[in-house]
């Protein structure tokens, strides 16, 4: 080991921690002892021997080496073996033959007679030493045994693991597994391979040393220093602005890289000095390349120092016609859009042609991948592998032949052939020749035959299949069930070792029942043939094959085997029992003469890919190729492509939170009545889905021995649940998620019934897990009353509850209450609807009839008939029977009834208004909305213009107007405040309250410069006075930055006090107050407060009572972050330099810090331009969310929002949503209005309101003249006037509000309501005005 490499490994060893290696296991005790001996006595580097020197000199040095380390070479056998391992291959074979002929030869005599010796470095010696070891290692036990036997210090232990262990495992089959698990070893091997590449691979050296500067340059590295920015992150060497290795020469060229999946090309730097592929963020955005987080955060430096925390998925790239698949690290800036590293070139066997400035791919003759061998312990089953078997006609197995039963015998299929190009013709001839040779097909005389077609295989070849679609129409279905994926995965619980078997040409292993061959005939240009084995493409083949393989495997399928079609997975809990399990399965396959495809089999693995999932001891996740399929999907161009995309997403839905919510905008496009129009909403939906798949969750295997927790919840429209289990770390991990829509009847359930429904549906969904558990499992619900309903032994309230309680008796559970705020997962799932679950058309429960039927009395009939006489059309129907028959109208009890059993009424009469009022105000439904009220009335009545009349009535209902919130977009565009000319001229101020007490403080005074965005944070108390605030502002702001010109603040009593007014006059600044209840006026301070609160949570969330200690750090962090509005940091704008933020940095000073310098003036001008641009963007974004302003005129009646403005608001959830109505006096600004408030509250509230807090009060005296809620009328002070409407007397009264006793209000009410409130005053008014009541 060279000194430089030793220093590097020493630095690596210091950073290594034992948790990076969980350990190793092996039964080879001799290997453990040997490793321990080497570790106990660390062997230093003895130098590299030149094989061209004389043998005696080498023998002398080797003898000295053996003498210095007797523990490693205790006998002649170990010395001789060490010597043999250091000979060239031919010389080694020669020496071994000599030793077999003469066993008494010493190691010195072997060297002398062999004549040629290969010297090597320490790494090669270690490789040779353990070259004979071929068994797969389990890390955990191996390292534990090694540590216990080796008596050595911690540093040498790490050094051994990092340096010696990878080399000793170099020829092991699972070498890549180690590299992926041990990041230190991976990084080290990458560096070593890169460093030695130029020496060991001559073909990468440029052939022409006089290269053109325009395309290929040759550079010499001038430094060996390594600028590592952090010691706890992955190491990537770099020089200038590129990832470089500093131990060899570097060559560059630029080529156009084609990305066929994204239909684009990008200029790409081919850099043999780079160790990583990189791509810029701009390129990723421009071509919408999918990325994912990268767990190894890397600092790269040079011209563009930054942190890399994302990389692309593996992309298909074409370079000079050479196709490769690789991934890129995403960087902010780089000299080229992308760069391909040396490592990628090496891994893909690509060389640079320096004379032609192109790339070429060498034939990998020496790297041909051999078919994986059957492990030695299973050699007895070698005769069932595809390598020892050619496809031949299998023997029929009684009872398992493939039967084809048809629904009718006399059928004819269309006679046609699909046209085939020459390439497919050759493939067809090859397949038919092979089929005839093996006997699986034969020529046929059948009169019905199906055409052939070709589908591509994974490896790129073509497979001939028959298009049996015409025949499938006449084939009787096979009802044998295919296994459910979820139930298959559940059987794997507790297993730690897996073997996967794949059957070769699985369908062709089953014979067709004699006499059914002609039914499977197919035609092609060569003629008509028929299958003697089960073919691909026929509809009943999958079900029959599942029955076939289940029967073959028999009882083993229930214990340690799961199979889905031709995919067989054997799982065990230990190595010893796994061997037995695998042999059992192989014996079953051998008895049935089945053949396995050895190339696709995997033996004794800790993790495998099976039916689309990555399965391990911990749980299962989707395979990366399925995720990549979604991540690489481009924008769908039509409904077919969109359905294909949603199909891929639906396969992964159990790993995607909020699937239904995310796919909702996409599903809308698939509706029949929706026109295809792709908008940014759909684009964002696809991007959100892709982001969820970047890091999918791991779902744990269900374990019947672990504690079970079921959390359920119900929303208005759906139910949700999460099933979890408690593991060894006392934490609950999810087993699965569930959510489902409610049916139409279930939507009408009470809250308790909906919560009960969530439990019932969840138990049904996971019944195979939860039924008959030995120990009770826990159910958590956020509905306290539900516990009593379930545990109550009294008579059930209804039949539905009785059925549910009977169903619950099959389960052993305990139910507990937990608030909804804690039950957040199930609560969220109940609001995410599984749109794939069918909703039954007819529910077992009858929906509640909400119709408040109006009694059809004789008086009502007479009133209707009277109204008929005033309507010409209805009167004609009443008197003309032929006309009634023509329009399908019946006459019952004097009433006209249409085909929908609706009573026909004249339009817009006193009768219709009475009906609307009855249903809206006096029915069992409380003030229903327009749609609901219309649907209810239409069940019994109809008339012309019914919808319009109902809409007008509801919109003018006083109770609805003041109590129901509005769902429209807010009124009023944003009016940004223009920026000032320089820092600290215009400020904004506010307080952050409700902070935990820290060092005697419980609030924070925030001052923000509106120009630079710099913030000053001063701890204070909630009870601070105006005088204290003025002193604090003087000492912390004015003393450092001078007098401001203006300050914007809210209407806090401190800033409106006389003390503060005197303070403002003293320092000559103007106070401007934000509009009451309109935070957008001072949005800057609001956003600053939010950012400060987030930063405080980051630094003291675990110890919140220490926040005062972190204020200076939070202020520094905020003021040194680039602000989106100015594109600079507040500190840099004010002080004209950037401070040092860590010991590794130096401050960058500007030569011109004078505020009157040309540079400063230019900076201020740039900042102002950025602020103006930002204001325009904010206004554009904000105005997108508002609707056109409703202009109010003086004299209009409006209502004021209570809850958002605080106006006349009490902390009472049942208080009305709006106050009023009030008259508009005038318009006092672009979006502000002054209202005529009662004298009693004018001193309490500002009379000016923003338009977004106002709603127009609709009042139609013909419908309902009352303008105030009768429950709000307290003591009547005075009656102003009266009016008669529809034989009802209305009074305009001034009264004391019940909701706000200190408030005097006025409005219209009925005589009956006024009499209930104050009979004496009302009677006096009637008497004085001579009213005839």
Curated annotation (Swiss-Prot):
Comp. bias regions, Polar residues: 218-231
Domain Reverse transcriptase: from-to ranges: 436-615
CDD domains noted in UniProt: retropepsin_like, RNase_HI_RT_Ty3, RT_LTR
Alphabetical GO biological process terms: DNA integration; DNA recombination; proteolysis
Question: Which UniProt key words apply to this protein?
Answer: Aspartyl protease, DNA integration, DNA recombination, DNA-binding, DNA-directed DNA polymerase, Endonuclease, Hydrolase, Magnesium, Metal-binding, Multifunctional enzyme, Nuclease, Nucleotidyltransferase, Protease, RNA-binding, RNA-directed DNA polymerase, Transferase, Transposable element
Q: Which residues form the Peptidase A2 domain?
A: 266-342
Q: Where is the Integrase catalytic domain?
A: 979-1138
Q: Which residues form the active site?
A: 271 (for protease activity)
Q: How is it modified after translation?
A: Processing of the polyproteins proceeds by an ordered pathway, called maturation. It involves the initial cleavage of a 27 kDa capsid protein (CA) from the N-terminus of the polyprotein, followed by the cleavage of a 56 kDa integrase (IN) from the C-terminus. This leaves a 72 kDa protease-reverse transcriptase fusion protein (PR-RT), which does not seem to be processed further.
Q: Does the keyword Membrane apply?
A: no
User: Whose protein is this, by species?
Assistant: Schizosaccharomyces pombe (strain 972 / ATCC 24843) (Fission yeast)
Q: Give positions of region: Disordered.
A: 199-231
Lineage per the UniProt record:
Eukaryota, Fungi, Dikarya, Ascomycota, Taphrinomycotina
User: What SUPFAM superfamilies does the annotation carry?
Assistant: Acid proteases, DNA/RNA polymerases, Ribonuclease H-like
Chain sites annotated for binding Mg(2+) 2: 990, 1050
Binding positions (Mg(2+) 1): 502, 566-567
Recall the GO molecular function terms of this protein's record: aspartic-type endopeptidase activity; DNA binding; DNA-directed DNA polymerase activity; endonuclease activity; metal ion binding; RNA binding; RNA-directed DNA polymerase activity
Q: Identify this protein by name.
A: Transposon Tf2-7 polyprotein
Q: Which Pfam families match?
A: Integrase_H2C2 (PF17921), Peptidase_A2_2 (PF12382), RT_RNaseH_2 (PF17919), rve (PF00665), RVT_1 (PF00078), SH3_Tf2-1 (PF24626), Tf2-1_C (PF24614)
Note from the entry: Retrotransposons are mobile genetic entities that are able to replicate via an RNA intermediate and a reverse transcription step. In contrast to retroviruses, retrotransposons are non-infectious, lack an envelope and remain intracellular. Tf2 retrotransposons belong to the gypsy-like elements (metaviridae).
What is any one of the record's Gene Ontology cellular component terms? nucleus
């Amino acid at each position: 080991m060279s000194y430089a490499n030793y220093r590097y490994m020493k630095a690596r060893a210091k950073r290594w921690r034992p948790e990076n290696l969980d350990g190793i296991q092996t039964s080879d005790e001799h290997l453990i002892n040997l490793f321990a001996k080497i570790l106990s006595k660390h062997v230093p580097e003895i130098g590299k021997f030149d094989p061209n020197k004389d043998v005696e000199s080498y023998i002398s040095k080797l003898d000295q080496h053996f003498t210095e380390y007797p523990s490693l070479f205790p006998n002649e056998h170990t010395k001789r073996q060490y010597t043999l391992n250091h000979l060239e291959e031919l010389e080694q074979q020669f020496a071994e033959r000599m030793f077999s002929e003469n066993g008494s030869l010493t190691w010195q005599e072997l060297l002398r007679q062999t004549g040629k010796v290969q010297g090597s470095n320490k790494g090669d010696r270690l490789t040779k030493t353990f070259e004979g070891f071929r068994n797969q290692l389990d890390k955990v036990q191996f390292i534990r045994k090694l540590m216990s036997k080796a008596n050595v210090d911690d540093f040498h232990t790490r050094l051994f693991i990092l340096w010696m262990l990878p080399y000793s495992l170099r020829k092991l089959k699972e070498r890549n597994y180690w590299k992926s698990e041990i990041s230190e070893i991976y990084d080290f091997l990458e560096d070593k391979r890169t460093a030695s590449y130029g020496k060991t691979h001559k073909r990468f050296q440029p052939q022409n040393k006089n290269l053109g500067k325009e395309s290929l340059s040759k550079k010499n590295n001038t430094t060996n220093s390594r600028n590592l920015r952090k010691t706890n992150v992955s190491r990537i060497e770099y020089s200038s602005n590129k990832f470089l290795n500093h131990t060899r020469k570097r060559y560059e060229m630029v080529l156009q890289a084609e990305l066929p999946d994204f239909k684009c090309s990008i200029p790409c730097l081919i850099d043999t000095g780079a160790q990583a592929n990189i791509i810029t963020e701009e390129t990723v955005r421009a071509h919408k390349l999918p990325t994912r987080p990268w767990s190894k955060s890397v600092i790269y430096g040079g011209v563009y120092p930054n942190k890399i925390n994302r990389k692309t998925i593996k992309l298909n790239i074409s370079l000079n016609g050479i196709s490769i698949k690789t991934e890129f690290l995403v960087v902010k800036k780089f000299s080229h859009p992308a760069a391909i590293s040396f490592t990628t070139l090496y891994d893909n066997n690509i060389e640079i042609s320096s004379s032609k400035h192109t790339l070429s791919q060498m034939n990998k003759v020496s790297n041909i991948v051999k078919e994986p061998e059957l492990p030695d312990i299973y050699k007895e089953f070698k005769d069932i592998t595809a390598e020892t078997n050619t496809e031949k006609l299998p023997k029929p197995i009684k009872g398992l032949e493939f039967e084809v039963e048809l629904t009718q015998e006399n059928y004819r299929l269309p006679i046609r052939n699909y046209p085939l190009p020459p390439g497919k013709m050759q493939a067809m001839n090859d397949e038919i020749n092979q089929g005839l040779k093996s006997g699986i097909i034969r020529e046929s005389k059948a009169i019905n035959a199906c055409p052939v077609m070709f589908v591509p295989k994974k490896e790129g070849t073509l497979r001939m299949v028959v298009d049996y679609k015409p025949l499938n129409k006449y084939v009787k279905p096979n009802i044998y069930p295919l296994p459910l994926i979820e139930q298959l995965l559940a059987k794997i619980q507790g297993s730690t070792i897996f073997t996967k078997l794949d059957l070769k040409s699985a369908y062709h292993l089953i014979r067709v029942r004699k006499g059914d061959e002609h039914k499977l005939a197919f035609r092609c240009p060569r003629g008509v043939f028929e299958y003697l084995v089960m073919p691909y493409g026929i509809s009943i083949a999958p079900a029959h094959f599942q029955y076939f393989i289940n029967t073959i495997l028999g009882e083993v399928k229930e214990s340690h085997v799961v199979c889905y079609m031709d995919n067989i997975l054997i799982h065990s809990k230990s190595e010893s029992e796994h061997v037995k399990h695998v042999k059992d399965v192989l014996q079953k396959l051998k008895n049935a003469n089945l053949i396995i495809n050895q190339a696709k089999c995997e033996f004794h693995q800790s993790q495998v890919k099976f039916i689309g999932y990555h399965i391990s001891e911990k749980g299962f996740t989707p395979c990366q190729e399925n995720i990549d399929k979604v991540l690489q999907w481009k924008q769908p161009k039509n409904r077919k492509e969109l359905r294909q995309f949603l199909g891929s997403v639906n396969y992964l839905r159990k790993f995607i939170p909020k699937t239904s919510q995310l796919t909702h905008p996409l599903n809308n496009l698939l509706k029949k009545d929706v026109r295809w129009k792709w908008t940014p909403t759909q684009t964002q939906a696809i991007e959100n889905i892709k982001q969820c798949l970047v890091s999918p969750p791991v779902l744990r295997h269900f374990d019947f021995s672990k504690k079970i927790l079921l959390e359920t919840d119900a929303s208005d429209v759906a139910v949700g649940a999460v099933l979890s289990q408690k593991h060894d770390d006392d934490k609950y991990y999810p087993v699965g998620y569930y959510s489902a829509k409610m049916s139409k009847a279930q939507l009408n359930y009470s809250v308790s019934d909906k919560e009960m429904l969530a439990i019932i549906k969840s138990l049904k969904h996971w019944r195979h897990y939860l039924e008959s558990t030995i120990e009770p499992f826990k159910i958590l619900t956020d509905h306290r009353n539900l516990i009593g309903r379930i545990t109550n032994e009294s008579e059930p309230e209804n039949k539905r509850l009785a059925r549910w309680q009977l169903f619950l008796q099959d389960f052993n559970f305990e139910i507990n209450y937990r608030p909804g705020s804690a039950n957040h997962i199930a609560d969220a799932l109940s609001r995410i609807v599984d749109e794939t679950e069918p909703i039954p058309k007819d529910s077992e429960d009858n929906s509640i009839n909400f119709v408040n039927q109006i009694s059809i009395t004789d008086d009502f009939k007479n009133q209707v008939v009277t109204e008929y006489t005033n309507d010409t059309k209805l009167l004609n129907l009443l008197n003309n029977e032929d006309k009634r028959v023509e329009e399908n109208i019946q006459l019952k009890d004097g009433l006209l009834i249409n085909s929908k059993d609706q009573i026909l009424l004249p339009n817009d009469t006193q009768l219709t208004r009475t009906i609307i009022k009855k249903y809206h105000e006096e029915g069992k439904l409380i003030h229903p909305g327009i749609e609901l009220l219309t649907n209810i009335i239409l069940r019994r009545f109809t008339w012309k213009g019914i919808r319009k009349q109902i809409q007008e009535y509801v919109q003018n209902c006083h109770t609805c107007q003041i109590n129901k919130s509005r769902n429209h977009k807010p009124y009023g565009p944003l009016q940004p405040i223009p920026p000032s000319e320089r820092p600290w001229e215009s400020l904004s101020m506010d307080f952050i309250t409700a902070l935990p007490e820290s060092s005697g403080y419980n609030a924070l005074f925030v001052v923000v410069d509106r120009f630079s965005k710099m913030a000053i944070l001063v701890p204070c108390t909630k009870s601070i006075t105006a005088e204290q605030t003025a002193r604090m502002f003087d000492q912390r702001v004015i003393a450092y930055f001078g007098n401001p010109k203006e300050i914007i603040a809210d209407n806090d009593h401190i800033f409106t006090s006389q003390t503060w007014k005197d303070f403002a006059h003293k320092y000559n600044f103007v106070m401007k107050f934000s509009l009451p209840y309109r935070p957008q006026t001072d949005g800057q301070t609001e956003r600053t407060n939010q950012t400060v609160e987030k930063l405080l949570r980051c630094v003291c969330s675990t110890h919140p009572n220490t926040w005062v200690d972190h204020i200076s750090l939070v202020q520094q962090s905020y003021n040194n972050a680039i602000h989106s509005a100015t594109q600079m940091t507040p500190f840099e704008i004010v002080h004209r330099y950037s401070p040092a933020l860590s010991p590794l940095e130096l401050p960058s000073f500007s030569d011109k810090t004078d505020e009157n310098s040309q540079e400063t003036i230019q900076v201020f001008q740039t900042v102002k331009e950025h602020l103006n641009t930002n204001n325009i963007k904010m206004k554009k974004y904000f105005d997108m969310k508002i609707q056109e302003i409703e202009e109010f005129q003086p004299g209009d009646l409006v209502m004021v929002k209570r809850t958002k403005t605080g106006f006349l608001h009490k902390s009472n959830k049942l208080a009305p949503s709006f106050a009023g109505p009030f008259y508009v006096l005038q318009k006092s600004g672009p979006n502000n209005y002054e209202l005529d408030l009662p004298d009693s509250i004018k001193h309490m509230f500002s009379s000016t309101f923003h338009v977004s807090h106002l709603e127009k009060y609709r009042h139609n005296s013909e419908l309902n003249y009352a303008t105030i809620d009768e429950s709000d009328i307290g003591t009547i002070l005075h009656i102003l006037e009266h009016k008669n409407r529809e034989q009802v007397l209305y009074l305009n009264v001034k009264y004391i509000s019940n909701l706000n006793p200190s408030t005097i209000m006025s409005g219209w009410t009925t005589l009956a309501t006024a009499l209930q409130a104050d009979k004496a005053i009302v009677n006096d008014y009637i008497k004085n005005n001579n009213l005839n009541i």
